[in-house]
């Protein structure tokens, strides 16, 4: 889903729990920590870290040292495919399925309502407009075991921060806690925030817009000058 404001980033933090008493310290240390960024509208050349065999002209425009450091200390994948809008790409990352398999082929928001504009000359195909669930029998969803759930079963603590956009309002998939995450910070059904500003309570109410965009769970920062990025952090 495209917006005329800055990049929307959600971060998945997956750390191996040190509370697994049945495992030795050596076994625990073999489990790597995982940080996965879901970034909207970011091209493969929109950073200083090259994802090609050589640095491109556009790579030289940007300065993203943290991405370079993460790639140097971790693992970089250079062959991938992303969909034109966010929900399909996010669900593919969560499930390992491509769009033809999970059939979430557009961004999701309202239950049983497609965001596609109505046209008299075209009948849109049936698709999973309610997003994804993990076991619940919800119409027009893809039911699948998620990556965070599998990691949690392997002893990881899973944290989601920022934009979620995995399932429509009123379905279990709107809440990352129902998709294998232990902690959810600000993630909900909408594909963007009502506002980035704490003085507006991260809500669209100040411009008389739909409250469906309000960011949940950040009430302690309401009425302050805390920018959304800082509140999530």
Residue positions per predicted region:
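Short, solvent-exposed loop/turn and secondary-structure capping segments
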Residues: 45-51, 82, 89-92, 102-107, ...
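Bacterial Sec-dependent signal peptides at the C-terminal "C-region" and cleavage site
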Residues: 16-30
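Formylglycine-dependent
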Residues: 109-157, 164-233
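Short, structured active-site-proximal loop/turn typified by the sulfatase FGly-forming signature C/S-X-P-X-R
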Residues: 55-90, 96-101, 157-159, 179-188
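Active-site-proximal N-terminal segment of extracellular/periplasmic enzymes that hydrolyze or transfer
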Residues: 27-75, 164
């Amino acid at each position: 889903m495209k917006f005329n404001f800055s990049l929307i980033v959600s971060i998945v933090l997956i750390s191996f729990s040190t509370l697994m008493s049945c495992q030795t310290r050596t076994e625990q240390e073999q489990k790597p920590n995982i940080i996965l960024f879901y970034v909207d509208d970011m091209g493969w050349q929109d950073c200083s870290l090259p994802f090609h065999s050589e640095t491109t002209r556009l790579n030289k425009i940007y300065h993203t040292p943290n991405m370079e450091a993460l790639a140097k200390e971790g693992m970089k994948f250079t062959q991938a495919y992303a969909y034109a809008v966010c929900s399909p790409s996010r669900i593919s990352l969560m499930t390992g399925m491509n769009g033809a398999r999970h059939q979430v082929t557009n961004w999701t928001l309202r239950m049983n309502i497609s965001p596609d504009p109505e046209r008299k000359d075209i009948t849109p195909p049936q698709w999973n407009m309610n997003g994804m669930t993990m076991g619940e029998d919800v119409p027009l969803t893809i039911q699948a075991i998620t990556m965070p759930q599998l990691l949690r079963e392997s002893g990881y603590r899973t944290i989601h921060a920022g934009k979620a956009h995995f399932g429509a309002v009123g379905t279990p998939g709107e809440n990352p806690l129902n998709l294998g995450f232990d902690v959810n910070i600000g993630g909900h059904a909408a594909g963007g925030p009502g506002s980035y500003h704490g003085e507006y309570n991260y809500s669209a109410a100040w411009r008389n817009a739909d409250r469906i965009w309000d960011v949940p769970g950040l009430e302690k920062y309401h009425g302050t000058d805390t920018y959304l990025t800082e509140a999530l952090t």
